[in-house]
Amino acid sequence: MADITDIKSIMYTEKSLQIQESGVLVVQTSPKVSKNQLKEVFKEYFGFTPVRVNSLRQAGKIKRFRGVEGKRASFKKFYVKLPEGAKIESLAV
């Protein structure tokens, strides 16, 4: 089962702030979290079940510095549609 610690961060990009107005929250998690586990986390910790959850895997970028090649970590991104009137006060911008 997933825990609240599996949510790495809330993404604040131009796109995520635009769709946040329509009640969609963009969440970055570890790649092992599933849609159902994320729904359970929202129900347990925030007191509501999301209307819809869409997910995608984001591959880590290859970065080079002074001839040494490295890779950023891969992550999973979720688009969580909140129910009408639901707010998460601690995550407000």
From Swiss-Prot:
GO terms for molecular function: rRNA binding; structural constituent of ribosome. Part of the 50S ribosomal subunit. Contacts protein L29, and trigger factor when it is bound to the ribosome. Keywords: Ribonucleoprotein, Ribosomal protein, RNA-binding, rRNA-binding. GO terms for biological process: translation. Signal peptide: none annotated. The keyword Ribosomal protein applies. This is Large ribosomal subunit protein uL23. It comes from the Bacteria. Pfam families: Ribosomal_L23. One of its GO terms (cellular component) is ribonucleoprotein complex. Belongs to the universal ribosomal protein uL23 family. One of the early assembly proteins it binds 23S rRNA. One of the proteins that surrounds the polypeptide exit tunnel on the outside of the ribosome. Forms the main docking site for trigger factor binding to the ribosome. The keyword Iron does not apply. InterPro entries: Nucleotide-bd_a/b_plait_sf, Ribosomal_uL23-like, Ribosomal_uL23/eL15/eS24_sf.
